[in-house]
């Protein structure tokens, strides 16, 4: 890596640290002013943003990205409107900074308060989705954190255009423009250097594929909160309402197959497999043709009715396809389903469909994932759907946050201790 590149990344981190100290004491009104200005800028910049996005889409097609990957990259007028609305929504959310989490008075008269404070400087490493640029900027700003954004090469032009709007919004609210910065290169060396700046950056959040997250975890000297791949299961129990199960599986698989909370694996109890599997194959085909990768038992059931399928490999049951592909397996019990999910899933989002409350509670307690659903689609594992506002991502870690990371999850805490001259004996 060149000395100039290292110097540039270090300077970005130094400026972010200085900005974070200002943001930590910035009023809610000032932060909301910047957010509302950003929303207006997004809404008023549709044409230049779409033009920048088209440059990225053209490059993606040239380099052979899949349709699902291109969908994640693509902005449309509707998606830009939704993006602006999500920023406005963040402005309406309660400011977590300064919230008193607990207060107590010690026998010696000391008054202790534990209050929420920003983490400080957060580095966010992500790939194709340009909406992450805005979502992360909005959430970091509202929670009083400075953000260093490093997007992927797939969305470089779009991210650059969005970052310019963020800087304008911050300046308009008289906040430091360095509070949100985009690293202006996609060179891997810049990322590697950023990951060593533990005296300036307090947390790294990678969002992307397995190779990116492993690279960040292996090279970072800064604490990492991983937003790992979504290998998400739906289990249809023998006591399931089968029409409900159809609707849930179709939604979980086909509504947006390129996102991390889409279902990738389907487990079906043997007691309902003969009836359910042909029905779900037809329902999926009616919504959008889905390639079913089946174990031997499910393949035999579909073959009896001449329904299309292919043989699954062992790897298919732990793969995030991000496409119209679903791995299908028949299981003999709920215990087998739970064990399979805990072995093969990414601990992200998993669901059971059943009318048996006892079975549901067993599944909810036994599946070790960030979000576990009963009679609902895995697609609901989302910050907006959980009432958190736009999320910074969905953590599959156990520390410091798990599941959708909203404003509160972007805070730490500190102790405020008030006395009247007490000294320790």
UniProtKB/Swiss-Prot annotation:
It catalyses: L-glutamate 5-semialdehyde + phosphate + NADP(+) = L-glutamyl 5-phosphate + NADPH + H(+). Its main location: cytoplasm. It is found in: Cytoplasm. Keywords: Amino-acid biosynthesis, Cytoplasm, NADP, Oxidoreductase, Proline biosynthesis. InterPro entries: Ald_DH/histidinol_DH, Ald_DH_C, Ald_DH_N, Aldehyde_DH_dom, Glu-5-SA_DH, GPR_dom. Pfam families: Aldedh. It comes from the Bacteria. Catalyzes the NADPH-dependent reduction of L-glutamate 5-phosphate into L-glutamate 5-semialdehyde and phosphate. The product spontaneously undergoes cyclization to form 1-pyrroline-5-carboxylate. This is Gamma-glutamyl phosphate reductase. It comes from Opitutus terrae (strain DSM 11246 / JCM 15787 / PB90-1).
